[in-house]
Curated annotation (Swiss-Prot):
Species of the source: Synechococcus sp. (strain JA-3-3Ab)
Keywords: 4Fe-4S, ATP-binding, Chlorophyll biosynthesis, Iron, Iron-sulfur, Metal-binding, Nucleotide-binding, Oxidoreductase, Photosynthesis
Pfam families: Oxidored_nitro
Pathway(s) served: Porphyrin-containing compound metabolism; chlorophyll biosynthesis (light-independent)
Subunit-level organization: Protochlorophyllide reductase is composed of three subunits; ChlL, ChlN and ChlB. Forms a heterotetramer of two ChlB and two ChlN subunits.
Gene: chlN
Protein name per its UniProtKB record: Light-independent protochlorophyllide reductase subunit N
Function, in words: Component of the dark-operative protochlorophyllide reductase (DPOR) that uses Mg-ATP and reduced ferredoxin to reduce ring D of protochlorophyllide (Pchlide) to form chlorophyllide a (Chlide). This reaction is light-independent. The NB-protein (ChlN-ChlB) is the catalytic component of the complex.
Length: 466
């Protein structure tokens, strides 16, 4: 085993057989239930799943969140109870108390092991109670916790209509229609857009990011027909054969496959809009596929890089090295962004890598390394944590981006760390969130500098006198 950084002209791929130290994918409920405002998520699992949700999402005593646990007991596992009747009772209670537009069943490891036919039960129950029931098997058998969102969106993609009636199209717009009336002035609305096939963007991001990316595309005359997921289940985008689709997150390969194979959509191969360079490449890929020019886009990116606050953050990163242990499948995009910021990426550990879906991102990473004159990193799929720790000890990186399980042990050994899970929940997409992304990356470096100024950079062991 060598600790040297790969300096070859191409990206070097390795595959180890390490364990997956990551959150359970059912944690996707944390950011999906606020995103889909009229939904209710029912996690079907054991007490362990319930404890995890309580710890990961907080115990909401005074609020009634739109998710719940259907706890499997011994009678369920031994097939002594009628699963259909139990789930029917719970769904009727949810319908009575919360009246959602859609109920999402989240399968877990236990439902997989006991071979619970959730799809068959959902189809029968949906017809009986009259509420759409979407089944997503977001269990711990996946590689990374972010793939829970991928499973949910892949299931929802199959519910997208092929066409929307003109009357329904006019009323779409959610709550705005209640306050401002139906849409009017269709000709005026069409002004400023180039004629092109429908474009649907998939991936769950905060509403301000949805607005930012939609407006960025609008500047070049590109109309976004819809987002998956939509804010309301009834506003799922229409996806007909030939609709162009593009993702905003690198962990949505299953959703992309479903859209292409089941809905006959056309996937736009694009990097992901993380950082100014990624956002520019994302817009360029969409515009190139649709045959639309993007004047001034390069200057738009340069303007973001020239911002004084961004320059201050870049000064902290230039010349430093970073090591990714692998956690949430955002590693390749973040590595590409940090190379553009002037850092050297020593290794990219990643739980799972879909080379087809991330082909454009990998190509951009390779091109960025060449332009910045830094060695191309080694990508290690399913990394073995023991070997990773040996490589970290040999390479001594300035920053390690890792899961929470390894952060404190590494800090105790004098290695500066950053929790990778923070990048999952923070708004990091688009031009407008560049400062927020850099603030996240530089926080441990700024913290260490502040502690060093106070003379607290070393841990001192003292004998306790009891």
């Amino acid at each position: 085993m060598t600790a040297a950084v790969d300096t070859s002209n191409t990206l070097h791929f390795q595959c180890e057989t390490g364990n997956y130290h990551t959150f359970c994918p059912i944690s996707c409920v944390a950011w999906l239930y606020p995103k889909i405002e009229d939904s209710f998520f029912l996690v079907i699992g054991t007490k362990t799943c319930g404890y995890f949700l309580q710890n990961a999402m907080g115990v909401m005593i005074f609020a009634e969140p739109r998710y719940a646990m259907a706890e499997l007991e011994e009678g369920d596992i031994s097939a002594k109870l009628n699963d259909y009747e139990e789930l029917k009772r719970l769904c009727l209670q949810i319908q009575r108390d919360r009246n959602p537009s859609v109920i999402v069943w989240i399968g877990t490891c236990t439902t997989e092991i006991i071979k619970m036919d959730l799809e068959g039960l959902a189809q029968k129950l949906e017809a009986e109670i009259g509420i759409p029931i979407v089944v997503a098997r977001a269990n711990g058998l996946d590689y990374a916790f972010t793939q829970g969102e991928d499973t949910v969106l892949a299931s929802m993609a199959q519910r997208c209509p092929e066409q929307v009636q003109e009357e329904e199209r006019e009323t779409r717009g959610g709550l705005q229609a209640l306050f401002y009336g139906l849409r009017s002035g269709k000709k005026k609305e069409e002004e400023g857009f180039h004629p092109h096939p429908p474009l649907v963007i998939f991936g769950s991001v905060p509403d301000p990011v949805v607005t930012q990316l939609t407006l960025e595309l609008k500047k070049y005359g590109i109309r976004v027909s819809g987002w998956l997921p939509a804010k309301r289940y009834g506003e799922l985008p229409a996806i007909e054969p030939g609709t162009h689709v593009v993702g905003v997150n690198p962990f949505l390969s299953r959703t992309a496959t479903t859209l292409v194979r089941r809905k006959k959509a056309k996937l736009i191969p694009a990097p992901f809009p993380i950082g100014p360079d990624g956002t520019r490449a994302w817009i360029e890929a969409i515009a190139r596929e649709l045959g639309i020019p993007t004047p001034g886009l390069a200057e738009r990116e340069a303007e973001v890089w020239r911002h004084p606050q961004v320059q201050e953050y870049l000064g902290l990163l230039r010349g430093k090295s970073v090591f990714f242990m692998g956690d949430n499948l955002l590693e390749v995009s973040l590595a590409r962004f940090l190379v553009r910021c002037g850092m050297t990426v020593q290794e990219i550990g990643i739980p799972y890598l879909d080379k087809r879906y991330q082909a454009a991102e990998l190509a951009l990473l390779e091109r960025t390394c060449e332009e910045m004159g830094v060695p191309k990193p080694t990508l290690v799929e399913k990394p073995d944590n023991y070997h990773q720790l040996q490589r970290i000890k040999a390479l001594q990186p300035d920053l390690v981006i890792t899961g929470m399980a390894h952060a404190n042990p590494l800090e105790a050994r004098g290695i500066t760390t950053k929790w990778s899970v923070e990048f999952t929940f923070a708004p990091i997409h688009g031009f407008g969130n560049t400062q927020a992304l850099l603030e996240l990356v530089t926080r441990p470096l700024r913290r260490n500098a502040a502690l060093k100024g106070l003379g607290w950079e070393q841990l001192v062991r003292e004998e306790a006198s009891v």
